[in-house]
Amino acid sequence: KKQEVNAACNKTIVEGFDVELSDGQIHHFTMKEEDQIAFLTCLALISKGETAIPWHPNGSSTQPCVFYSTDDMQKITDAAYEHRTFHTTYCNSLKIWVEATETAEELQEIYYGADVPETYQSDVLKAYLKAKESVGGTDESEAVR
């Protein structure tokens, strides 16, 4: 079950996230391993004072590379961090729940997207869920999308 949960978590992380940028549009960014490393490079460029940071939208090699402003790239890297951290935290809470199960029936109730009982939620997951609730979400199943 832990392998199933890990696989779903990794798939969700890699599929990426959406973020609204200064143009008012929602943009999608993938989080393949090379994307995650490149986001770190972008943060270094921001800290060096770069004002135009090149990136291929959605990790695509079929679209032209474009420049993103420092503010937009900061939004992108912040969203990337939140996306990865939330899903890793949620996955770890699911695995704690898996460890606590005593029957096959209980184990079957656990899947990626299930609401983790509060007993198995880390403090970090509780904080993420509370923040999600305050902006209109209601539970993990919405948050893990």
Descriptions of predicted regions:
Residues 1-145:
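A preference for well-ordered globular domain cores
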